[in-house]
């Protein structure tokens, strides 16, 4: 005997209700997974040192010399570098290195051994700066090289401009160095990959924000040279052609100069299409040194002795 129409309709209604409940649970699960994945990526790039993956990164080794001792070295025999930008300035390199004697990392008013990952960046790998510091010291021009890093992965130029999330830290670090008797000699800007990966990012807006950053740094560190690298390379995404010219334009501003063209270091120098592998870290340090050399030579002839 066939099932009554009313019973069949009731069963179909229950089946439909059950299916809808399953779909709601599935959608909720996918939403939670997506949120968790997004928060994980966000945290990897934005949480401060010591809060993600490796607790040892929060305990850098105290340097064998004090801030006061380094501050007593004549300025022509010491160099204070402030490195600013996104992940390629923030310890996201493939291999770690120790700069060795005579090179120091500055953070929160203290000096530490210049060992990757450097304090002030939110990555846990290697950096250009330990390698650059070692090259500068080995050349014999300086008795001490001080590296201060203020860098965070995935940041935009507007994050560093007045009103941005990282601007106060940028200015505060310069004030700390000045108060410690170690005024900044040069500010190395390595940022731009974020905007270069966005098709709708404006070169004009990038230049305007970077101009504000340079102006603020000139106020905080009047004698510092602001050095702008060409940094827009990303193998996985098409490059926005407006950003590199904006960096060139900013390098011509008063108090600024052109740094290295790191876009020449293509996929063979990258571990994942963006961040530097061991070969890339060495090549980037060499490129920074070559770009700084003419200015360093001029600086040595103009500083009071």
Explain the meaning of each model-derived region.
Residues 1-23:
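N-terminal Lys/Arg-rich, disordered targeting/topogenic segments
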């Amino acid at each position: 005997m066939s099932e009554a129409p009313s019973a069949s309709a009731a069963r179909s209604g229950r089946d439909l209700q059950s299916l809808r409940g399953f779909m709601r649970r599935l959608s909720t699960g996918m939403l939670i997974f997506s949120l968790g994945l997004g928060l994980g990526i966000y945290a990897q790039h934005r949480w401060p040192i010591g809060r993600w993956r490796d607790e040892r990164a929060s305990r850098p080794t105290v340097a064998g010399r004090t801030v006061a001792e380094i501050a007593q070295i004549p300025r022509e025999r010491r160099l204070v570098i402030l490195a600013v930008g996104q992940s390629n300035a923030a310890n996201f390199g493939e291999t770690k290195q120790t700069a060795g004697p005579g090179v120091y990392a500055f953070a929160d008013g203290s000096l530490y051994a210049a060992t990757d990952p450097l304090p002030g960046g939110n990555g846990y790998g290697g950096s250009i700066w330990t390698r650059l510091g070692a090259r500068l010291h080995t050349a014999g021009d300086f008795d001490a090289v001080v590296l201060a890093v203020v860098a965070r992965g995935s940041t935009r130029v507007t994050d560093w401009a007045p009103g941005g999330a990282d601007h106060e830290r940028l200015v505060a670090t310069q004030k700390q160095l000045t108060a410690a008797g170690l005024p900044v000699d040069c500010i190395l800007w390595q940022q731009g990959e974020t905007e270069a990966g966005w098709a709708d990012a404006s070169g004009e807006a990038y230049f305007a924000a970077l101009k504000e950053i340079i102006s603020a740094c000139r106020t905080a560190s009047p004698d510092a040279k602001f050095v702008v690298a060409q940094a827009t390379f990303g193998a996985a995404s098409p490059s926005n052609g407006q950003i590199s010219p904006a960096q060139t334009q900013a390098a011509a501003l008063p108090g600024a100069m052109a740094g290295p063209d790191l876009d020449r270091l293509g996929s063979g120098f990258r571990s994942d299409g963006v961040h530097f592998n061991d070969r890339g870290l060495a090549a980037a340090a060499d490129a920074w040194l070559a770009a700084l050399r003419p200015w360093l030579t001029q600086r040595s002839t103009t500083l009071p002795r």
